[in-house]
């Protein structure tokens, strides 16, 4: 049976640095766009438990063992991330279901206030990003997630008791603060547990549960809409969804923070789990916040482009909040609107599945697959805009087609897992990306103004412009990755000593810019 052997060099970082005469020792003063360098000493060491597991240089394991470890990781980690992502999306969009059943009338809010609820949610999301990034690095990741799930679930439950707009606005802001860390945390988890070629499918998988949430949310909304009692149906929406989320959060008390601490793996399986991700060169957890790595994140061209892509792309999210109202405006009642919202979730899931299959076929091409999904969404927007009022069915199909774009967002997030190395840099990158994610989501609902009902044409036109911009950014980012990989190949050909290894350098919390052998996936 074929075996896989861990091959590491025991040469010291001091020896290797002396051979790299062209490399400067001062990171901040020497940083240039595109520069690849190694610091004179490793920036840090791997997690202490990981170092102990990695002590045996002659460790070997079989492909069958690797598959079994992957299966065990999938069995534990994927359901947790998928269901949590579904729950957080249900909590986030409960507002749109509640709006169908009289929430706006009972709480005396107008269309502007309703739009502001989405804006304030993402304002909370925005202000929490950098504090959450630092706390995420300092605290045990699983406990940190548990606390946030518990707190945002409580906010959702409390919305059922609201009797006016200001109370709803305040709770939405707090819910945004507590939900802010979930996607950045899942990006880090995916990077720590999975090989780079496995990451797109896993990211698409847990992101696809936004679509599952839309289907389940529509079913729940339809069922709760049939309740006619002393408590209004819209209040039951918040109560049921909030309690579901509250109960699920307890799971994170038992989830390991990284592979070296996984109780569901034996000692040998932990070592295999680490060896599987060695070639990622992105490390594990590191509790030390490194300002040099944070500085690098802000100047990295790929981070800038990913950040801009995300902010512009989120303008398309307005359709998620207003889809039920757009469908209702086509002539359907509240219950039928809830049911007809279900295909949006089904198309989102289909988009994730198709993208995942294509990613398995092509080693590179995530960004180009995303471009294809964006083009399908663009077609949906044009259908809503250009199809006449006399053809509501055509417009309905257009609304459904707007849900191809989330696959593009998920593929972009997988690039953070795959292409940003160093725990601080990855954490700061995720926070920065989600600051712009928040800005996009703050702007988006303001483009769907109450005076545009029921078509919201200006909002649809804004989506069309944003889709054209992100398609252009995707092509530029693809070109950058191809150029940077070829440049590194050339540097290694000119100076082979750049490719020599330090023992376990893959787990030493080095950034992608500090590793000449690092190659970007696109």
Swiss-Prot record:
Pfam families reported for this sequence: MFS_1 (PF07690)
Regions crossing the membrane: 69-89, 116-136, 141-161, 173-193, 204-224, 236-256, 303-323, 338-358, 367-387, 396-416, 428-448, 462-482
GO cellular component: endoplasmic reticulum; membrane
Biased composition (Low complexity): 1-11
GO biological processes: dipeptide transmembrane transport
Record keywords: Endoplasmic reticulum, Membrane, Transmembrane, Transmembrane helix, Transport
Subcellular location: Endoplasmic reticulum; Membrane
Topological relation to the membrane, as annotated: Multi-pass membrane protein
PANTHER family tied to this protein: MAJOR FACILITATOR SUPERFAMILY (MFS) PROFILE DOMAIN-CONTAINING PROTEIN, PERMEASE-RELATED
Family: Belongs to the major facilitator superfamily. Allantoate permease family.
Record's protein name: Uncharacterized transporter C757.13
